[in-house]
UniProtKB/Swiss-Prot annotation:
PANTHER family assigned to the protein according to its UniProt record, in alphabetical order: COLIPASE, LEUCINE-RICH COLIPASE-LIKE PROTEIN 1
Gene Ontology annotations of biological process type: digestion; lipid catabolic process
The UniProt record lists the keyword Protein biosynthesis: no
Protein name, as recorded: Leucine-rich colipase-like protein 1
Origin superkingdom: Eukaryota
InterPro entries, per the entry: Colipase
Length: 161
């Protein structure tokens, strides 16, 4: 009966290699991919998923799984949160929702448009885009200020009355 010596020797060699690899690396670098999902991280290489992102308003980053398309997508603000630009929002839509100058994350329309709040009829305006009906006209020829007005005529044009 002959006993093969190779399997134990191969196992011992493999263990020695695994033990030796970290010792050959620079002392300031860590072995990559050692943190699991949910653990704190600073960069992608620390995570087994190769994905280190913020997952809340807290600036601390955590290891998270990648998307089906192998993308590493950070957490984005849900609707109703204050924002400054579209990329901060999950809906990719950061708009004014009232006369208040603050902007909030908001859902897009059924046609995937991001439409901001507009001034109602009668409100003082400086440009057509400020008004709900996209029509900003002076009340009279001598009027120093313009107001939001309804569009008129068969073709609903922005014409002075």
């Amino acid at each position: 009966m002959s006993v093969s010596v190779w399997p134990p020797l191969l196992l011992l060699l493999l263990l020695l290699l695994l033990w030796a690899v970290p010792t050959f690396q620079d002392k300031n670098t860590r072995v990559s991919a050692y943190k699991g999902i949910g653990e704190m991280c600073r960069n992608n290489s620390e995570c087994q998923s190769d994905c280190c992102v913020t997952n809340s308003l807290n600036p601390q980053k955590f290891c998270t799984s990648q998307t089906v398309f192998l993308e590493c997508v950070p957490w984005r603000k849900p609707n109703g949160f204050l924002c400054e630009e579209n990329t901060e929002c999950h809906s990719n839509c950061c708009i004014r929702t009232s006369s208040n100058p603050d902007r909030f994350c908001s859902s897009k329309t059924i046609f995937m448009q991001c439409i901001s709040w507009r001034k109602p009829e009668g409100a003082i305006c400086q440009h057509h885009l400020e008004c709900w009906d996209l029509c900003c006209l002076p009340l009279s020829e001598n009027s120093p200020s313009s107001h939001c007005t309804k569009r008129t005529g068969l073709l609903a044009l922005c014409l002075p009355v």
